[in-house]
Amino acid sequence: GIAKQLGLNLIIIDNETPGKAENERITPEILAPYLSDDVALVTLEVIQYRSGARNDIKSLTDLVRKHGAFMLWDASHAVGAIEMDFDKNGVDIAVGCTYKYGNSGPGSPAWLYVNKKVQAELQVPIQGWFSQGDQFAMGPVFEKAEGIRGFQIASPSLIGLRCIKSAFTMIEEACIGAISEKAAIGTEMMIQLYDAWLAELGFTLLTSRNPQERGGHISLGHPDAARICVALREFADVIPDYRTPDSIRLAIAPLPTSYVEVWDGFARIRDLVSSRQYEKIEKTDSRVT
C-alpha cells in the first residue's frame, strides 16, 4: 500500500503466536523494542478484534510520542462500548466504524478523529472536494480547509448519517459510562457462565478475566468452533462470530442486550454442544460466520 509506494518499511508485531502476547494484548514492554527515532507511525487496535483484549491507550500513546512518532488508534471494536477519553489520554489520531457498538448497521460511514493540536501539520492522502478550502473553486491547486473539515473527502451517505445520528443520540442519552459498566458486567457474566458450563465441554477462554483488559466481547476457543457457530445460528437462534482458526466471539451490545439474554444464549450453547448437535453440520471452510 502506501508504505510500499513511498519506500517505507511496514513492520508487523506478532501478537498472535502462542506465547508472544497474553490474549493478543499489546503492552509497552512488547511495543518498546520496535520503536526508534525513524518510526513515523504506529497503529494499534483499542480492542483486539479477535480475542477482545483491551490495550491501554494512554501508556502506549505516551510511549510512541516519546519517540517522536504519531499514534493511530483503530477504535472499531471499542466505540460505543467503553470509555476512551481521547483528550485525557493524549490521542493524536483515531479511526473506527459505526456498525458495531455504534448500532448503525452494515455500510454506515466510518469516522476519523484528529486532535486539534495536529490538524494543521497533517495532510490527507486523498484530496477530495470536501477537504478543499473553497469547495467550489475547482482550481489546479489544492488548498486544505482549516480544522477537521480539511480531512473529509467527499459526500457521505445521507441515509447512513441519519442512522448514525439516531444511534449515537441514544448512546449519548444512555451515557458511555453506564454503557461501559454494563459491558464489563455482561462480559463478567459470560466468563462465569463459561466457567460453570462450557469449560468442561472443550472450550478455552481467550480473553482476559480482568475487566480493565477487555471490552464488550469475549472470545472462546474450541476445536470445532466453525461448525458450532453455524449450528448455533441454524438450531439455537444464537448469532456468534467465528474467527480463524478456532475462535468464537460472543458480545454483549450494552444498549439492547439484557442479562437474561446473555444467560439464555450461554444455556443454548451449553445444550447444543453437550448434545453434540453441531456434528450435524458438515465441515465448513468459511472464515467468518
PLM-predicted stretches and their roles:
Residues 1-289:
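Pyridoxal 5′-phosphate
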